[in-house]
Amino acid sequence: MSLLTEVETYVLSIIPSGPLKAEIAQRLEDVFAGKNTDLEALMEWLKTRPILSPLTKGILGFVFTLTVPSERGLQRRRFVQNALNGNGDPNNMDRAVKLYKKLKREITFHGAKEVALSYSTGALASCMGLIYNRMGTVTTEGAFGLVCATCEQIADSQHRSHRQMATTTNPLIRHENRMVLASTTAKAMEQMAGSSEQAAEAMEVANQARQMVQAMRTIGTHPNSSAGLRDNLLENLQAYQKRMGVQMQRFK
């Protein structure tokens, strides 16, 4: 799974189902594909979204700022700074500084995520705040590792509060991952289609998958329900691949 797919999965797992979730998913896809390069407009849009908690807005603002190229002197946004101040708790700030020093030594996404997971959500948010306020720099991979660790902790607490049966991997994250991968596969099918005879069919299947993912994000579904979506899409994709005589990577 690519780094950006993983980041998208984790970030979306903490956003409540509804039309806004589908909209945010689209914005993230556009940002990661380099299609949305107006950071100022993006942040203004994010600031005025309803429903989202200040921390979720802070995390999204941090991700957008990391990903969208911007002029050096671009002003930092107050709503992101306030969300990433660790509730003003000096203990969170102390821990954030310790974590930041460790993250400086971690250059990989997984290494950074592993280190960050042993800290509290408040300390993780404060550490993001340090980086956001340009008080320190880490690699982009390290910063994304920090983001995903924070989202995993939030999703874990949401999952516990949902009183769902615990499994080895958080079902909310797994569910979101299936939907992100279904979208990615749909995109790949469209690219593969080209001008072949089956192009219309491939586009149709991809379009159906995309609409299904959007509908699931909008109305909200049980974490197990996306397994069926994944299986249907895989079936369609494999049948299409057979005819095209190509192989694509499976996803779970």
From Swiss-Prot:
**UniProt subcellular location:** Virion membrane; Host nucleus
Q: Where is this motif: Nuclear localization signal?
A: 101-105
Q: Looking at the record, which segments are called RNP-binding?
A: 165-252
Q: Which GO terms describe its molecular function?
A: RNA binding; structural constituent of virion
| InterPro entries for this protein | Flu_matrix_M1 (IPR036039), Flu_matrix_M1_C (IPR013188), Flu_matrix_M1_N (IPR001561), Flu_matrix_M1_N_sub1 (IPR015423), Flu_matrix_M1_N_sub2 (IPR015799), INFV_M1 (IPR037533)
**How does the record say this protein sits in the membrane?**
Peripheral membrane protein
Q: Which Pfam families match?
A: Flu_M1, Flu_M1_C
Reported function: Plays critical roles in virus replication, from virus entry and uncoating to assembly and budding of the virus particle. M1 binding to ribonucleocapsids (RNPs) in nucleus seems to inhibit viral transcription. Interaction of viral NEP with M1-RNP is thought to promote nuclear export of the complex, which is targeted to the virion assembly site at the apical plasma membrane in polarized epithelial cells. Interactions with NA and HA may bring M1, a non-raft-associated protein, into lipid rafts. Forms a continuous shell on the inner side of the lipid bilayer in virion, where it binds the RNP.
Protein name in UniProt: Matrix protein 1
**Gene that encodes the chain:** M
